[in-house]
């Protein structure tokens, strides 16, 4: 169980977690943060989003139900890249890759990512995501 959990501080570490999903086949996200740009600037919207949509990675995202996120959802094809909405927001994200999960804190004073590579916990988180996905609005 060595290195099953890592705490990675800072915006660069958070970006590296998102970039890691590009190496896999599938990724699920619960992105309820509305203030992420305070920590990572426009990187997600202007850099990562293009890489993700241009990759072969199949994605599902549950995002906060905001006008901006509804506009973001319109960019998705609904097959390879799907989106659903929750009315709540929180300043953290959950990222599920093929073989890892990450909880991301967008606390501007101390942003960080907790990366978990213990496959039993990752499998459990994938079950949790299925429940969230099933309950989220289209």
How does the language model describe each region?
Residues 1-7, 11, 26, 37-138:
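PLD/PLD-like phosphodiesterase catalytic module centered on the HKD motif
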Residues 20-27:
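Glycine-rich phosphate/diphosphate-binding loops that line cofactor/substrate pockets in enzymes
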């Amino acid at each position: 169980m060595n290195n099953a959990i890592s705490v990675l501080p800072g915006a660069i570490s958070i970006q590296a977690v998102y970039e890691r999903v590009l190496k896999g086949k599938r990724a699920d996200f619960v992105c309820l943060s509305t203030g992420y740009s305070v920590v990572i600037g426009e990187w997600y919207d202007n850099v990562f989003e293009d890489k993700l949509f241009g990759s072969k990675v199949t994605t599902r995202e549950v995002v906060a139900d905001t006008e901006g996120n509804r506009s973001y959802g319109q960019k998705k094809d609904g097959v390879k890249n799907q989106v659903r909405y929750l009315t709540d927001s929180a300043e953290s994200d959950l990222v599920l890759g093929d073989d890892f999960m990450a909880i991301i804190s967008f606390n501007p004073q101390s942003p960080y990512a907790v990366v978990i590579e213990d496959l039993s916990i990752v499998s459990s988180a994938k079950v949790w995501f299925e429940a969230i996905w099933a309950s989220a609005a289209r």
